Amino acid sequence: MKNPITKFAAAAVIITAITLGLFEFIDTGSQSGVVWAEVAQNVEASQGVIWRLRETGSRDPNDDWPNSYMITWRSPAITRTDRYRGGQIWRTIYYNLDTKTVIGVLHDVQRYHKEAMSDERVQSVRADKDRWTTSQSLINHLLARKHHSLDQKMIDGVLCEGIETTDASGLPVKSFTARGWVSVETGYPVLGEIEIIDDGGIRHTTTLDQFQWNVDLSASDVEPEIPTDYEPL
């Protein structure tokens, strides 16, 4: 059975993939102020990004929506995800592909785990990230889905334009809706929304916001500090 760190790490990789992938829609026929091809280029070129993710519909009875959320820092070599519950940090997972290191911290039980990553694991993590952040492969995937433009609207004081798909073909769900909202001024994503009804009829929602793009993320700033009273897992 996977330990809590391994399960959280796997979930964090999937969420990271979905997060950046959502915004690489392209609407080549759009007449709006946003050039979606440039949005995809902006996302791919950003050397560092930070965002918040909130979810509903989890089957985990310990989740405490709306007080549960995740903050992720990501650069080409580094990914860190902090999960919060009840306003307190609960779990941290950190990957450094340059040093081939993974660190997991279980703040709720004051335990941690640190290990070296094999070359195979580094390649696996990098492949999971590249599958969604390389514009060519992801764009080809998303262009296969029907999508349409949304009217402009203000989001947190920022004028945004959006795009939406409800094409659930090939997905193991009853229904699927994904929306990406981009700043008209900067061409960077501001908000992402995903709504799914699974085969069991349970509605799941994911909200991605509080984006910071082109952030200089160094390992010294992002690597989690392990309190001295935490014990090895």
What are these regions (language model features)?
Residues 93, 180-181:
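A residue-level detector for well-ordered beta-strand positions
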Residues 101-175:
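Non-cytosolic head/periplasmic domains of membrane-anchored proteins
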Residues 7-22, 141-161, 169-178, 184-233:
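Non-transmembrane domains of secretory- and envelope-associated proteins
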Residues 43-48, 74, 98, 156-158, ...:
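Edge/loop elements at the starts and ends of beta-strands within beta-rich repeat scaffolds
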Residues 49-59, 164-169, 194-195:
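Generic short beta-strand segments
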Residues 1-38:
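Single-pass transmembrane signal-anchor helices and their membrane-water interface zones
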Residues 43-62, 78-81:
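A short, Trp-centered hydrophobic/proline-enriched beta-strand micro-motif
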Residues 66-132, 195-207:
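An acidic-aromatic
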